[in-house]
Amino acid sequence: MEYLIGIQGPDYVLVASDRVAASNIVQMKDDHDKMFKMSEKILLLCVGEAGDTVQFAEYIQKNVQLYKMRNGYELSPTAAANFTRRNLADCLRSRTPYHVNLLLAGYDEHEGPALYYMDYLAALAKAPFAAHGYGAFLTLSILDRYYTPTISRERAVELLRKCLEELQKRFILNLPTFSVRVIDKDGIHNLENIAFPKRDS
């Protein structure tokens, strides 16, 4: 039902998520933010069971911030991804597993931009582009066709829009607006939301 997408460029990561909060077949909100700021240059995108997403993301968020307060420096995106994955794996083997799918995007001064894909079974993979949700089945082929490692920001936004337009055309559910953000050496920046007009009945 939900959709996340991430595209890594040479010096940035572009991410987007839908803004719908739904319960079963009922839409509860159309302005729900599924992105959680871990640190100045790390963003966690989270979809899944309604309670699990917020509880798990905020738990990781507070622990990453606690690490900075204790040590005086922030975790790198790689370290944050492995910390998140370990916590998800530990919970999976407990009585209270979290049913969440994640994208973690960040920028490190030494390693550059990074995008990590994580699913509810705690599988972790570094990827040049990634997507979660049913929409991933419709858009991963577009990303595979048009993505290049040296893609510019303008071309990445065009590619993102192409994916979202395909979603509007082929996906039966209504996902009208998407939050878009970019992470680079200067931090996390909000881009203009991408919105689509409601379909004619």
From Swiss-Prot:
Q: Where in the cell is it found?
A: Cytoplasm; Nucleus
* Protein keywords: Acetylation, Cytoplasm, Nucleus, Proteasome
Keyword Acetylation listed: yes
Write out the tissue specificity statement of the associated record: Detected in liver (at protein level).
Which is one Gene Ontology cellular component term of this protein?
A: proteasome core complex
Q: Where is it mainly found?
A: cytoplasm
Positions carrying N-acetylmethionine are M1
Q: Which SUPFAM superfamilies match?
A: N-terminal nucleophile aminohydrolases (Ntn hydrolases)
Say yes or no: keyword Iron-sulfur present: no
Q: Name one GO biological process term.
A: proteasomal protein catabolic process
Summary of subunit composition and partner proteins: The 26S proteasome consists of a 20S proteasome core and two 19S regulatory subunits. The 20S proteasome core is a barrel-shaped complex made of 28 subunits that are arranged in four stacked rings. The two outer rings are each formed by seven alpha subunits, and the two inner rings are formed by seven beta subunits. The proteolytic activity is exerted by three beta-subunits PSMB5, PSMB6 and PSMB7.
Which family does the similarity line name?
A: Belongs to the peptidase T1B family.
Job of this protein: Non-catalytic component of the 20S core proteasome complex involved in the proteolytic degradation of most intracellular proteins. This complex plays numerous essential roles within the cell by associating with different regulatory particles. Associated with two 19S regulatory particles, forms the 26S proteasome and thus participates in the ATP-dependent degradation of ubiquitinated proteins.
Q: What is the name of the protein in this document?
A: Proteasome subunit beta type-2
The organism of origin for this protein? Mus musculus (Mouse)
